[in-house]
Swiss-Prot record:
F-actin cross-linking protein which is thought to anchor actin to a variety of intracellular structures. This is a bundling protein. Ubiquitinated by FBXL22, leading to proteasomal degradation. The lineage of its organism: Eukaryota, Metazoa, Chordata, Craniata, Vertebrata. Ca(2+) 1 binds at residues 769, 773, 780. Coiled coil: none annotated. Residues 756-791, 792-827 form the EF-hand domain. This is Alpha-actinin-2. It comes from Gallus gallus (Chicken). Residues 41-145, 154-260 form the Calponin-homology (CH) domain. It holds the Pfam family Spectrin. Its main location: cytoplasm.
Length: 897
């Protein structure tokens, strides 16, 4: 490798352009005389194929690149083909100097294009020097195939690379960075083809792991469809660590030129299409003008005869139809044609302007379709339209005068017909035959109003007849219908007059009969309503559910019922009088065969209702008698239960109250030994228990009272609930008092308090228990402590209160007071004493063993200690050591155990 670098350093073949700098970028060109074998193979194949792609245009080709260019003839031919210029006439001799002369002509031509050739001489080419021949061909490729490639002012190589990068940017797995490694997988070549000719290759089916297949596919498509010969072997590209850059650039430049030519062709086609589009648009505008002009002229031709028609119509409706058609023409048909005419002129001027701008000859419409021709036809249309409108208005005004009179007839006739509609049917009705007096009187008033209305319409009927006569005289076109209508109105008017008189007579006759019936109905209503109310009230009273709680109340109800029964004969006489009135009404209706109902308009009470309710009253009277007697018997039984319960309750209630007072007094006043007090309280308790049978008997009587639904008892102030509460309170009080004495005995024995001390404590507590309820408030307790010699500050008193009143109730019980005083005056055991005792059992060790506990303590206490003592973990600990210190502290609440 070092020797190769040295050769490259000592032997350099340089070539550059005087004015272009792209040649200075080809520093990768090997300066040594020997090429890398792989690169040489690739360059031979690529350069040979490139040369043949141009020589075939001249009908020839080369087989061996260093041999076929030795005489200079094909070299000169190659330059002529790729440049399009003629070179000097070659020498046809076969001598060496002839060949050198021809090669020099080619080299001179290359130099004339601005390429400076250094160390490349004709002799080396004639001698078949591979290195020099390939270098010369590469120089030609650079000058004629790559030099003209420029993208955004880049050099030839950079421009070609940038073109490749832009074209392949959207494709996956393609990243073109150079002209060697970036092309090894073949996807770059396939992407270039697909970008410009997506119809030739399906890029989505390509596999990056098949580089040889990708390269061969791209080369085959390029050779078959793009006229780019196969210049490389896929195996050489894939298997070479770094493919030859010149070979790749040469092959890729062919794609650039192939697709650049296609883009130029596309530009040319677009230019042609643009010109053709302008021409087609002009032709479309011409055709549209011809079509619009023809349609507009045809419409004018059809419309003018319609406007020139002056045939008059006989009716106003027909003339109004013509006027409406004309207005419809002016409103709907003409405005679009005005727009078409304006648009036609605009299109004509626009078309002429476009033709003038695009250097086309002016447009000449068909004969008769010039803008001036259309304007003339339009003027004739306007003239015909003006005369037609004047004629229409004059004719309409003439018909209006005649139609006004006919319309006046129709309006008056319609008004009269609407008024008269249904009047004959109303007058023929016999609704009064089944109407009430009020309804008949209303019918009479309504009939009087109708007669007034009938008289008022007399003038209208006369006017209708006069107008009909005038229309006949003026020879109105529809006079026959007018006469027929007028005759019907006059005939109907005569009929209405006759029917009106007959209805008045029938209404007045019916009114007199109904007035008689109405007086009877009114009298019935005045007497039936109070009597009906009396029966309803009686039924309510007889069926009323009475609730009484005493004998006096039921006796009062019985007396009221007897008074009610005494009024029944008088009520029956009133009932018969009311029924006779209704019988008189029915007699009148039957006598005159009237179709009215016998129902009374002044009363909702019917005869049948009176009969039914009277029978109901007669049934309820004996039922009420029976109910009242049964209730009287029940009240006598309830009174016996009240007296029986009251007799017992009035004894038990005071007895309980007396016992409560005795217990309360004894708890305060008892003196002497606590055991004597206990015996005395036990005797009290036994006496109370022995009294229980009296409570049970009272409960039985109370049960009977509840079953009888007796809720009050005027014979006693004690209820069963009072007795129960008092009895339970008595039992609770005696039990609590006994418990207090028992607690005092335990406290005395446990704390070593003497009976004298206990008596002093009781005396002090009773003295400061000002309300005598067994409780001292804060102030009383503080005064008690001060009286016993305690000098208390606020903090100390608060501490003591937290001991005697831990729940914050605000009071101190006697037991709490005893507990506090015993703590203050008696010896107490402490955690330190217990710890010292355990230390003795443990032989002064800080821990104790289970065996030692079982040996020194009873089995039950020993097991209790073993189960609850924690393991000892302090200094000198042994297996099974138990911590008696923590255990003892926990017994007195001084530990967290």
């Amino acid at each position: 490798m070092n020797s190769m670098n040295q050769i490259e350093t000592n032997m350099q073949y340089t070539y550059n352009y005087e004015e272009d700098e792209y040649m200075t970028q080809e520093e990768e060109w090997d300066r040594d005389l020997l090429l890398d074998p792989a690169w040489e193979k690739q360059q031979r194949k690529t350069f040979t194929a490139w040369c043949n792609s141009h020589l075939r245009k001249a009908g020839t080709q080369i087989e061996n690149i260093e041999e076929d260019f030795r005489n200079g003839l094909k070299l000169m031919l190659l330059l002529e083909v790729i440049s399009g210029e003629r070179l000097p006439k070659p020498d046809r001799g076969k001598m060496r100097f002839h060949k050198i002369a021809n090669v020099n002509k080619a080299l001179d031509y290359i130099a004339s294009k601005g390429v400076k050739l250094v160390s490349i001489g004709a002799e080396e080419i004639v001698d078949g020097n591979v290195k020099m021949t390939l270098g010369m061909i590469w120089t030609i490729i650079l000058r004629f195939a790559i030099q003209d490639i420029s993208v955004e002012e880049t050099s030839a190589k950079e421009g070609l690379l940038l073109w490749c990068q832009r074209k392949t940017a959207p494709y996956r797995n393609v990243n073109i960075q150079n002209f060697h490694l970036s092309w090894k997988d073949g996807l770059g070549l396939c992407a270039l083809i697909h970008r410009h000719r997506p119809d030739l290759i399906d890029y989505s089916k390509l596999n990056k792991d098949d580089p040889i297949g990708n390269i061969n596919l791209a080369m085959e498509i390029a050779e078959k469809h793009l006229d780019i010969p196969k210049m490389l072997d896929a195996e050489d590209i894939v298997n070479t660590p770094k493919p030859d850059e010149r070979a790749i650039m040469t092959y890729v430049s062919c794609f650039y030129h192939a697709f650049a030519g296609a883009e130029q062709a596309e530009t040319a086609a677009n230019r042609i299409c643009k010109v053709l589009a302008v021409n087609q648009e002009n032709e479309r505008l011409m055709e549209e003008y011809e079509r619009l002009a023809s349609e507009l002229l045809e419409w004018i031709r059809r419309t003018i005869p319609w406007l020139e028609n002056r045939t008059p119509e006989k009716t106003m409706q027909a003339m109004q139809k013509k006027l409406e058609d004309f207005r419809d023409y002016r409103r709907k048909h003409k405005p679009p044609k005005v727009q078409e005419k304006c648009q036609l002129e605009i299109n004509f001027n626009t078309l002429q302007t476009k033709l003038r701008i695009s250097n086309r000859p002016a447009f000449m419409p068909s004969e008769g379709k010039m803008v001036s021709d259309i304007a003339g036809a339009w003027q004739r249309l306007e003239q015909a339209e003006k005369g037609y409108e004047e004629w229409l208005l004059n004719e309409i005004r003439r018909l209006e005068r005649l139609e006004h009179l006919a319309e006046k007839f129709r309006q008056k006739a319609s008004t009269h017909e609407q008024w008269a509609y249904g009047k004959e049917q109303i007058l023929l009705q016999k609704d009064y035959e089944s109407a009430s007096l009020t309804e008949v009187r209303a019918m009479l008033r309504k009939h009087e109003a109708f007669e007034s209305d009938l008289a008022a319409h007399q003038d209208r009927v006369e006017q209708i007849a006069a107008i009909a006569q005038e229309l006949n005289e003026l020879d109105y076109h529809d006079a026959a219908s007018v006469n027929d209508r007028c005759q019907k109105i006059c005939d109907q008017w005569d009929s209405l007059g006759t029917l009106t008189q007959k209805r008045r007579e029938a209404l007045e006759r019916t009114e007199k009969l109904l007035e008689t019936i109405d007086q009877l109905h009114l009298e019935f209503a005045k007497r039936a309503a109070p009597f009906n109310n009396w029966m309803e009230g009686a039924m309510e009273d007889l069926q009323d559910m009475f609730i009484v709680h005493s004998i006096e109340e039921i006796q009062s109800l019985i007396s009221a019922h007897d008074q009610f029964k005494a009024t029944l004969p008088e009520a029956d006489g009133e009932r018969q009088a009311i029924l006779s009135i209704q019988n008189e009404v029915e007699k009148v209706i039957q006598s005159y065969s009237m179709r009215i109902s016998a129902s009374n308009p002044y009363s909702t009470v019917t005869v049948e209702e009176i009969r039914t309710k009277w029978e109901k009253v007669k049934q309820l009277v004996p039922q009420r008698d029976q109910s009242l007697q049964e209730e009287l018997a029940r009240q006598h039984a309830n009174e016996r239960l009240r007296r029986q319960f009251a007799a017992q309750a009035n004894v038990i209630g005071p007895w309980i109250q007396t016992k409560m007072e005795e217990i309360a007094r004894s708890s305060i006043e008892m003196t002497g030994p606590l055991e004597d007090q206990m015996n005395q309280l036990k005797q009290y308790e036994q006496n109370i228990i022995n009294y229980k049978h009296n409570i049970d008997k009272l409960e039985g009587d109370h049960q009977l009272i509840q079953e009888a639904l007796v809720f009050d008892n005027k014979h006693t102030n004690y209820t069963m609930e009072h007795i129960r509460v008092g009895w339970e309170l008595l039992l609770t009080t005696i039990a609590r008092t006994i418990n207090e004495v028992e607690t005092q005995i335990l406290t005395r024995d446990a704390k070593g308090i003497t009976q004298e001390q206990m008596n002093d404590f009781r005396a002090s507590f009773n003295h400061f228990d000002r309300r005598k309820n067994g409780l001292m408030d804060h102030d009383d307790f503080r005064a008690c402590l001060i009286s016993m010699g305690y000098d208390l500050g606020e903090a100390e008193f608060a501490r003591i209160m937290s001991l005697v009143d831990p729940n914050g109730q605000g009071t101190v019980t006697f037991q709490s007071f005893i507990d506090f005083m015993t703590r203050e005056t008696a010896d107490t055991d402490t955690a330190e004493q217990v710890i010292a005792s355990f230390r003795i059992l443990a032989s002064d060790k800080p821990y104790i063993l289970a065996d030692e506990l079982r040996r020194e303590l009873p089995p039950e206490q020993a097991q209790y200690c073993i189960k609850r003592m924690p393991q000892y973990t302090g200094p000198g600990s042994v297996p099974g050591a138990l911590d008696y210190t923590s255990f003892s502290s926990a017994l007195y609440g001084e530990s967290d155990l």
